[in-house]
Amino acid sequence: VYPERLRAAIDAGWHTGKELPGSAGLGHVGAMKLISDGSLNTRSAYCSTPYSGIEPLTYGTLSYTPQQIEDYMRLATEHGFDIACHAIGDEANTIALNAVAATHAHGSIEHAQMLKPVDIPRFAELGLTASIQPQHAMDDRDVITRFWANPAGIPYPFRALHDAGTTLRMGSDAPVAPLDPWLAISAAVLGTESSDREPFQPEQCLDVHTSLAASTATGRDRLASGDPADVVLLDADPYAADTPEAMRAMPQHVVMTLLCGE
């Protein structure tokens, strides 16, 4: 639910987790999706330092004022909605985190592509999930050195967030990147799309265990009794995939998909 439609959703009795009619239990109302800034490639992600090599100087664009962001988060939280706040630039993330702290909102920051070091521990402190898209780092690695040459924050700080105790969830942001979880897992673990190229920020790479867990609905990489029987079976071992080519080929090894056990 976008902010401009939030009041109508509240009036209709919607809230996060409510089952959608006709979905047979497979569809539920999600979070309030608030897009606080733009993107790196368009130089519209809102940053605390100006973009490199651009005249006139630009810091990106904030879609709402900080007060509006706080007000929408408060309204959502008071009426049973989680928040999913798109924030890419470091200053947009600071503003989003400040709003969460002020409103006690719960949910996720989407993307979190550049963070000031001081903001990294705040995710865990505030109980927020960092919803990350590692394939974007592969798409952006060359652009980062061009537009974020002197950033105040750390771009794509996957390992730093994990080490600070943040709950990570990984996705694709499709159609921006292909709807393929193995691309994200490969990027997070190996930091490159090809064995012919050095990893990007290897100090921020994650292990396979963490990446697989962040790619599941349960947040674990092991099945447990009582889990939903939504399972993909492979005839190859992702823990043994030590090259991006091997990890990115995992869709070719799917032998069975179960949804609700069927």
Name what the model sees in each region.
Residues D180, T192-A217, R222-E262:
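C-terminal cap of metal-dependent C-N hydrolases
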Residues Y2-E4, L34-S39, I88-D90, M114-K116, ...:
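Short, glycine-/Ser/Thr-/acidic-enriched flexible segments
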Residues G60-A102, A214-P238:
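Long hydrophobic segments that form regular secondary structure
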Residues V29, G38, H86, I109, ...:
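Divalent metal-coordination and catalytic microenvironments
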Residues M114-T210, A217:
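Active-site-adjacent C-terminal substructures of enzyme catalytic domains
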Residues E91-H106, W182-S195, V232:
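Short, electropositive alpha-helical surface patch
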Residues V1-D90, R122-T129, P134-Q135, I185:
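Metal-coordinating catalytic core of metallo-dependent amide/deamination hydrolases
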Residues V1-K33, G107-Q113, P117, V143-R169:
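Phosphate/diphosphate-binding loops
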